[in-house]
Amino acid sequence: MKTIVVCSGGLDSVTLAHKVAAEQQLIGLVSFDYGQRHRKELDFAARCASRLSVPHHIIDIAGIGGHLSGSALTDNVEVPDGHYAEETMKATVVPNRNAIMLAIAFGLAAAQKADAVAVAVHGGDHFIYPDCRPGFIEAFQRMQNEALEGYASVKLLAPYVDVSKAAIVVDGEKHGTPFSETWSCYKGGEPHCGRCGTCVERREAFHLAGVPDPTAYEDQDFWKAAISRYSATEVR
């Protein structure tokens, strides 16, 4: 299937891009500038597109993002430290973000006669982000079937929606994903902070996957305390 991957430049979506390149016909990456403080992730998406020799579309929706106020990812709100399973991480929710991005991605796919749009939502996102859950994926597909009826047939691929981030790391290793060429940290500094939810989740995923983590973290050990109250299953 001719597929466009929604790629932020993070570990999950870059791994998905490599997976699609190996298993489908990757025809492009689409990224979104929504005014996120960690905008540097877009540079990593661009590198991925160059590496896989496909076009990279960066869609500027910062004007919209500016109205979706209250999120630590877009506003002058402190990004919380800790595990993703903590209530404080709800500060990182950007309301309706995936619905907005996917609607644009589907329009792009229809215009380019693509067969599918692929998105890297995963099981670890379910607790905090409602637009990463299976119910949302299924409902969005039904909505797009109606929206594009008679014009295009575009499938929403979400191969990681029911698996852990550790499983994504394993899949990334299988497909040769250069993990050092991905960006996760929500604080957007240099290097990864090692303390925000996405840094903790990234560090934990490599540990559970049994794959060496090439990432430099400002705080190398915070993740151990952050995950101590939560259980996870090793994937291999």
From Swiss-Prot:
Signal peptide start-end: none
CDD domains according to UniProt: QueC-like
UniProt keyword annotation of ATP-binding present: yes
Binding-site list for ATP: C7, S8, G9, G10, L11, D12, S13, V14, T15, L16, A17
Free-text function comment from the UniProt entry: Catalyzes the ATP-dependent conversion of 7-carboxy-7-deazaguanine (CDG) to 7-cyano-7-deazaguanine (preQ(0)).
Protein name stated in the entry: 7-cyano-7-deazaguanine synthase
NCBIfam families listed in its UniProt record: 7-cyano-7-deazaguanine synthase QueC (TIGR00364)
InterPro entries: QueC, Rossmann-like_a/b/a_fold
Gene3D superfamilies: HUPs
Required cofactor names: Zn(2+)
Cofactor annotation comment: Binds 1 zinc ion per subunit.
This protein's UniProt keywords: ATP-binding, Ligase, Metal-binding, Nucleotide-binding, Queuosine biosynthesis, Zinc
Origin: domain of life: Bacteria
Biological pathway: Purine metabolism; 7-cyano-7-deazaguanine biosynthesis
GO BP, one annotated term: queuosine biosynthetic process
Gene from which the chain derives: queC
Enzyme class: ligase
GO MF: ATP binding; ligase activity, forming carbon-nitrogen bonds; zinc ion binding
Species name: Rhizobium johnstonii (strain DSM 114642 / LMG 32736 / 3841) (Rhizobium leguminosarum bv. viciae)
Record: residues binding Zn(2+): C185, C193, C196, C199
